[in-house]
């Protein structure tokens, strides 16, 4: 797995998710398996089979999260001093069609959440913004065609 950028907050969120899966979910599933064993014949025991499936899925999630954490490149965005857009930038854009301002922060793909205006570094809008500076006009290609934005401000602050 290739290394990928992530903010400190995103890294801690993945760590918390891993701890929950290992120490809460795993324990609950183990208890469910033990309880299901008490129902008798395991070959026809739906509760046992369901608990074993949940165990398998949980273990896969744990494995995936451990790999993500091992390959994460944690970026402390508040220490970035740049006037051009890179990973971690909070950008203020003016949509040239609607004349509305929008604010996004460019984060890692595992921490992107459009409801919080956190966009993945791999998203089309982030890719169009990388390397740009305040005052630049950006074209973002979407399924509905091109959209144009003016980049008003670039900041490196925590979200």
Curated annotation (Swiss-Prot):
Keywords: DNA-binding, Transcription, Transcription regulation. Gene3D superfamilies: Transcription elongation factor, GreA/GreB, C-terminal domain, Transcription elongation factor, GreA/GreB, N-terminal domain. One of its GO terms (molecular function) is RNA polymerase binding. Transmembrane segments: none annotated. Signal peptide: none annotated. Necessary for efficient RNA polymerase transcription elongation past template-encoded arresting sites. The arresting sites in DNA have the property of trapping a certain fraction of elongating RNA polymerases that pass through, resulting in locked ternary complexes. Cleavage of the nascent transcript by cleavage factors such as GreA or GreB allows the resumption of elongation from the new 3'terminus. GreA releases sequences of 2 to 3 nucleotides. Belongs to the GreA/GreB family. This is Transcription elongation factor GreA. The lineage of its organism: Bacteria, Pseudomonadati, Pseudomonadota, Alphaproteobacteria, Rickettsiales.
């Amino acid at each position: 797995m290739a290394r990928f950028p992530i903010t400190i907050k995103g890294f801690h969120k993945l760590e918390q998710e891993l701890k929950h899966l290992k120490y809460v979910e795993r324990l609950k599933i183990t208890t469910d398996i033990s309880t299901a064993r008490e129902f008798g014949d395991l070959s026809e025991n739906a509760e046992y089979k369901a608990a074993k499936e949940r165990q398998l899925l949980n273990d896969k999630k744990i494995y995936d999260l451990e790999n993500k954490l091992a390959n994460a490149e944690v970026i402390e965005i508040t220490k970035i001093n740049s006037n051009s857009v890179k990973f971690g930038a909070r950008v203020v854009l003016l949509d040239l069609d609607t004349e509305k301002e929008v604010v996004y922060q460019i984060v890692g793909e595992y921490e992107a959440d459009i409801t919080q205006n956190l966009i993945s570094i791999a998203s089309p809008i982030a890719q169009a913004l990388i390397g740009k500076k305040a005052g630049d006009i950006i074209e973002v290609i979407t399924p509905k065609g091109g959209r144009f934005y003016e980049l008003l401000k670039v900041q490196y602050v925590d979200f």
